[in-house]
């Protein structure tokens, strides 16, 4: 339960401040001559969060203080440079990182390391190519022997900051790496990665001896909560609105440099675990997810409608449909449901392969050939997606059976036998 009551005016003020930044970003996006855009995307940015609905609970004998709120409805644009969507993405990333980190530290007994990798500041014209190169260089780094031996899983987050005094940009990586707990007891071993060693290796893969600023350290904190709080630093924004909203030139530079780039990557053992996490309907990670605090009964709706540079607020009692939606819970599927889904996907793969074999362009004219080639391309993409999902499901079946919340099979043996994976 929320420990400190919030004033409605403070909730409205916080959303309004964010909305004004969003409007400025939308205007820069619309006015840019350097960005490829569509009228649909421009409109989506301009109208993002125009209507926000919260379910709220009032403090006793108050119609201004609220003790809890939960988002009921919102329209979003999902643009990386929209500050409202940035915040939502950061919250989701924080949940993902916390849950997966807990899984690795509790199930695998791994321990987290923080790594920072930088390059010297660069100009705006160099930013796009520099980020592309950094993404390739970090892959080279983690393929080196010492890193492969030690790093079991790692999350790479790109951040770009700007020096306003000399108008240069500073792209850098924050990395959360997971190592076996014995790593910290072998500081004198050849496989231990020191700061000088990390600097030398990063200079070599980057082919840049000017690099001086790198760091590697154990996640610190007196309590488990303190250590988890440090881990969440990884979820902060890739680019701050105070930087990219400084001018049209800066906005264009950062937008084009970051467009299409993967700014957070889950690697090593996390490459498959993140895929499992994304399709989890079976409670596989439930015990590792942050617990939501119990809320008081939510009784009213706070609706914010953006109009002429302000949010107009209205408060009314929740209707029956809204109450039902708030009370709705999603039931976990069982291990039997998982097995059925696996065989359904196997059947889809078989059907796709059959369709691919049947396509023959030998006697087709140019128009027919183009249609068939496009169909073949789509089928091959579908086949690849099926294969990837099946591999992830096989990983779950062989490694995570104990984590199923609801089980219909009598044993793991029966489960694997039913899936024909013994």
Task: Identify the residue ranges that each predicted region occupies.
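Right-hand nucleic-acid polymerase module
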Residues: 1-169, 179-422
């Amino acid at each position: 339960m929320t420990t400190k009551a919030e004033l409605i005016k403070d909730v409205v003020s916080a959303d309004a401040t964010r909305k004004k930044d969003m409007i400025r970003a939308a205007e820069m996006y619309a006015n840019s001559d350097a960005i490829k855009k569509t009228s649909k995307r421009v409109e989506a940015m301009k109208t993002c969060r125009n209507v926000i609905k919260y379910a709220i609970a009032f403090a006793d004998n108050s119609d201004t203080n609220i003790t809890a709120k939960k988002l009921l409805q919102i329209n979003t644009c999902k643009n990386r440079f929209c500050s409202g969507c940035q915040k939502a993405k950061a919250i989701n990333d924080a949940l993902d990182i916390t849950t997966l980190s807990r899984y690795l530290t509790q199930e695998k007994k791994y321990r987290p390391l923080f790594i920072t990798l930088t390059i010297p500041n660069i100009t705006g014209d160099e930013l796009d190519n520099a980020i592309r190169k950094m993404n390739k260089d970090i892959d080279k780094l983690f393929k080196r022997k010492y890193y492969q031996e030690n790093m079991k899983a790692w999350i790479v987050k790109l951040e770009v900051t700007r020096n306003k005094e000399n108008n240069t940009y500073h792209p850098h990586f924050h990395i959360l790496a997971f190592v076996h707990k014995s790593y910290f007891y072998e500081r004198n071993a050849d496989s231990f990665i020191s700061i000088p060693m990390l600097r030398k290796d990063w200079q070599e893969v980057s082919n840049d001896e000017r690099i001086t600023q790198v760091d590697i350290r154990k996640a610190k904190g007196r309590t488990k909560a303190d250590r988890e709080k440090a881990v969440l630093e990884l979820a902060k924004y890739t680019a701050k609105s105070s930087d990219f909203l400084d001018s049209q030139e800066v906005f264009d530079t950062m937008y084009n440099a970051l467009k299409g780039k993967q700014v957070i990557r889950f690697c090593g053992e996390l490459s498959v675990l993140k895929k499992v996490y994304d399709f989890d309907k079976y409670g596989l990670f439930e015990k590792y997810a942050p617990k939501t605090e119990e809320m008081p009964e939510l009784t009213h709706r706070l609706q914010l409608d953006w109009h002429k540079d302000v949010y107009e607020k209205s408060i009314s009692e929740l209707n029956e449909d809204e109450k039902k939606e708030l009370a709705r819970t999603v039931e976990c599927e069982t291990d039997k449901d998982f097995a059925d889904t696996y065989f359904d996907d196997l059947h889809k793969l078989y059907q796709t392969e059959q369709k691919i074999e049947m396509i023959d362009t030998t006697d087709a004219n140019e128009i027919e050939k183009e249609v068939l080639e496009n169909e073949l391309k789509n089928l091959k993409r579908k086949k690849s997606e099926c294969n990837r999902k099946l591999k992830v499901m096989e990983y779950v079946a062989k490694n995570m059976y104990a984590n199923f919340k609801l089980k219909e099979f009598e044993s793991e043996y029966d489960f694997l036998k039913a899936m024909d994976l013994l």
